[in-house]
Amino acid sequence: MSVGNVGKQREKTKDSSAKTKQKTLFGFFSKIPNVKQEKSDSTLSSSSNHDSNHDTPADVDNSSNVNKNSSSPERELPTSPSHHANTEIDSSSSMLPPPSSDPFSSPLSSSLHRSSPKRPHDSLGEESPGKLLRTSVKQEPDSEEEIDSPTKKKSFKSLDTSIFQAEDQFRHPVSSKLENSELSEVDKPFIASRRSRKPVSYAESDEDEDFDDAPTKGSRHKRIVSDDESDDYVEPDHISEASSEASLPIDEVESMDEDVDGYSDHSVSVAAPIPKKESRKESSNSLYESYRLGSQIASPSPSVSGSASPTKSNKNGVLNREEKRRQRMEAFKKENNERYEWLLDVRDADQNRVGDPNYDPRTLYIPPSAWATFKPFEKQFWKIKKDLMDTVVFFQKGKFYELYENDAAIGHQVFSLKLTDRVNMKMVGIPEASFDYWASQFIAKGYRIARVDQLETALGKEIKDRQRTQKEEKVVQRGLTQVLTSGTLVDEAMLTSDLSTYCMAIKESLQSDNEEPSFGICFIDTSTGGFHMCEFTDDIHRTKLDTLLTQVRPKELILEKSKISQKSIRAIKYCVSSSSIWNFIKPYTEFWDNERVEREIIAGDYFKNGLEGAPKILKSYLSEKPLAISAFGALFWYLRQLKLDKDMCSMGNFDEYDASQQSTSLLMNGQTLKNLEIFSNSFDGGSEGTLFHLLCRCVTPFGKRLFHTWLCHPLRSGTAINARLDVVELIADNPVIRDTIWGFLHKLPDLERLISRVHAGRSKPADFVRVLEGFQRINSAFDQLREEFMEVAEGTLLGEIIQSAPNMKEELEAWTRAFNWQKASEEGVFEPEIGFEAEYDTSQKYQSELKNELYALLEQYKKQLRCSSLNFKNIGKEVYQVEVPSDVKVPVNWCKMSGTKKTNRYYNDELRKKIKKLLEAEELHLAIMSRMQEKFYIRFDSNYEQWLALIKYTASIDCFFSLSQAAAALGEPYCRPEIIEQKDGHLYFEELRHPCINASAASTFVPNDVVLGGESPNMIVLTGPNMAGKSTLLRQVCIAVIMAQLGCWVPAKRASITPMTSIYTRLGANDDIMSARSTFMVELSETKKILDECGPKSLVILDELGRGTSTYDGHAIAYAVLHHLVSNIGCLGFFSTHYQSLCVDFMHHRQVRLMQMAAAVDEKIRRVTFLYKLEDGICPKSYGMNVASMAGLPEKVIDAAEEKASELEQASASFINASDDIALMSDFLQVLRISKSIEPLTAVNIPLILDSFE
């Protein structure tokens, strides 16, 4: 049709058009232009994250004619920077969104620039649609720019070729002269009509982004996303805007989604204004642009300048900014005028209200009437969310994960995510690519995370829908795939520590508070799939439970609701971190007993042959230890909620955990581990300054975890200790062996965790390659050790390990022939070698044939158009576009898809059909690859036991290597301890130093000689001034014993020990307010445990016992305890005290040696110089006044204190009868004697009185 005819026809329809223009333009503002910047004429990543996965019906026929298309919302045409530059418009209505902060900007990369979706009025100001169009078509680009690259939201068939009417067989793109002409009824298909605003809906489109191109470096996208269903989120590489001449492609505006309220949900701010460019005088293809923009303009006035006044816009029926806002808010209120009643009156699944004792905050009751009113997407969401009300649910919508309702409020309030504040279904969103980061952030704050993923692609759904006979709901299928908690993380990227993270279930059996409780314990490290179980009877102070919790330090706890005692809860709180997660679950229905566990094992496919194929430990516990099995049942149930039960249980990795291991290891209870700062320091609970931090120099993560176990249980057998020392000495003295070990260890990934992911079938191809490469290094290293060092290592523990390690050479060689390792590592896909997988080969061949057909078609087009420069161009999901020079005419039935100043890109029906066949073939090929990946993992997992054994042997070598490295770091002097097997205990250290302090202050630390047992007394009573180093000396002796029995060198010139059976410590002064126990009560309780459990080969450390009560009572208790230790038990140890008279009482005892920490005192200036030297004798005073002076107390206060101290000393001397034992003068013990009806006090029966005290 000519330009003149168009004008005449437009005049005839002018009146009718004016009547409808107000209605049709309302819909314009529900569409937001997608403004993006792309790399010029190269890989156009502007379409990479292009299409939204809207929840609109999946079976909508998009292949209808133009008239049908025009009745539905179309994508609008965004404008490039040049379209806005230098146009004569009102300064108050800016065409560009203002710079602002990015609420979704990920802290993972501070340099990453992300553009911001804006609401319509933010990006358009007060401009009318007509003004936007006119200003966008009246400018000339300075360089080759994208002037027409709409990316289709609809299917290929939706691009009806009838809109390209022409009389000639070939034509140029529509002339820009049509912009000033009137349109006839014939040309109305070029201008899509707009619908009025739809009700909020959660139906979704079946479009998918699987074939989007990844963003390329050099592209900076300025995206404006239309609504919360939009899945376009672009993460461009950071580049300088001045470094590229890439223009912003003209893109379609996404069709209106039915569940939006007019606000942009995924709003991401533009970092900086777009540089202005010179305007151009005329634009080509303006009529086509009008069609693409999708706005129906009744009578656009021809404007040369491209400017328009607000008044003129209003005359043309365009709403001003306030009117638009009002219309939008009215529509919003209409659909969201009241909140769901069941969200106001919250009840759990059993309809218990908040505050009810039986209220379960994990569930939500939704009445049947509400289900009937839900849209398909709402129904899908609430079906999952109603059982996860205590969990933040990340719901996948295309390229976003979205959080709704209370979860959205958390995201907004805690993490400042952009909130779409609806009355119902308020929402925040994050990009799909940043899920791991945001999930880690939520977990770090203590939240549980649920992940709901799309279980099918849009194209896959379309293929399935064609095969179904029954009509399905038009919503993409989604399902709960993961629930993440801090104690059950399995993804290596989310794990913040190389050490094990445990989730523990505790079952208690207790008849009354005064009885000894029994416990069943089961805990798991989900990153490796290892279960640990035990059952024991404890004392009323929960000593064994305290020891186990201190060793394991669980991150998450599962307890039986209303079935665990308050004493046990207090004991648990004392041992675990304040950040640990507590889960109280229902008895019987969730905290299963052994009968229920047995039924579930039989019913489920967890082990081969059901219960018969279960691990031996589990089967024996089922018949013998019901409490432990009940704890396992609770953990079993919990893992099922997290979708981890099959992955974890099917590994069969069960063992029995013995916290004390009394027959084989040095026993250290929880109190000792805390007092000696073995794993956590007393400052901030961290590992800095601890013995573990000093000694653990393992290279591999699985080596560190094994070393932690070694340190929890140092050896007791002299033979085993010497075997370890031999290996450590061999590695330390042989640099070649040391270098060989380090050479293969430092390149290994965390194989123990990675093979558990392979077993679960959740490993990425790149990680699977890392696993295979890691085992190749290990296998090669063991081969080298066998060939080169077997003669040296023979007869040692290292030689046994080298000989015992399985040789997996043949299996690994088979894997090298299975698939392309490089492609799997770099591209994340398994490409099997030809002939390895027939199904894959057939699918690959079919795809190649389809691609060949496409290129044959391209050659045909080259001949048809007589142009040899034609080629294919991929723009996002619109792949294989035929790129044609702009001066070449194309057939009339070719549909233009995008273009630049020099080239245009087209589709036609023939090309679309072939492309669709190729895309469907690729979709089916993905399913084949998924099945093939599963086969690979099953085959690898068939040798799980051999792989795990290889890891354990490697971890042991890593621990030996760590001990040799730690010895070298101790500083001189250090020595190999001499281990002496004899009946009586014996310790000898010459020039002993504290290893942790010595590591940072080697030149200033004062060493000391320590001798206990043998020909010397078993017990040293230690006196000395405050701050003289008594507590440090006590700790360094204990640590030296632990190091020696661990198999490590010790920081001494010479060391000789008899292996100890246990170490007990009573240090410091603390009360226990929660248990209503005073400082003195805590002291006596801990002392009572020591007296009950220590033996002749125990090392006991008591620091200032009796400080928590009066002088006489404290002295009496100290005397009685010390007498019992040296006379009845005969253990080795130190007893530090400030009771000088106590030394006098034991001056002639043959098993007591009186020693002091030396100090030089200047009485004139009240100055004490601490010498930190251990020497024989009794310190005459504690020099408290001198320490008070050093602390800065006022002189008047100190003078008064000295005067009072002198009076008290004289009064005590006159009162005490030198012939009486001071212990017998204690009022405390006299009261006890009367209350217990015990005979008159003697040194023999004082321990009996103390033992009766609780």
Swiss-Prot record:
Matching Pfam families: MutS_I, MutS_II, MutS_III, MutS_IV, MutS_V
Swiss-Prot/TrEMBL keywords: ATP-binding, DNA damage, DNA repair, DNA-binding, Nucleotide-binding, Nucleus, Phosphoprotein
GO cellular component terms given for this protein: cytosol; MutSalpha complex; nucleus
Segments of skewed composition (Polar residues): 79-90
Residue ranges with Acidic residues bias: 204-213, 251-262
CDD domains in the record: ABC_MSH6_euk
Compartments (UniProt record): Nucleus
Protein name (database record): DNA mismatch repair protein msh6
Organism of this sequence: Schizosaccharomyces pombe (strain 972 / ATCC 24843) (Fission yeast)
Lineage: Eukaryota, Fungi, Dikarya, Ascomycota, Taphrinomycotina
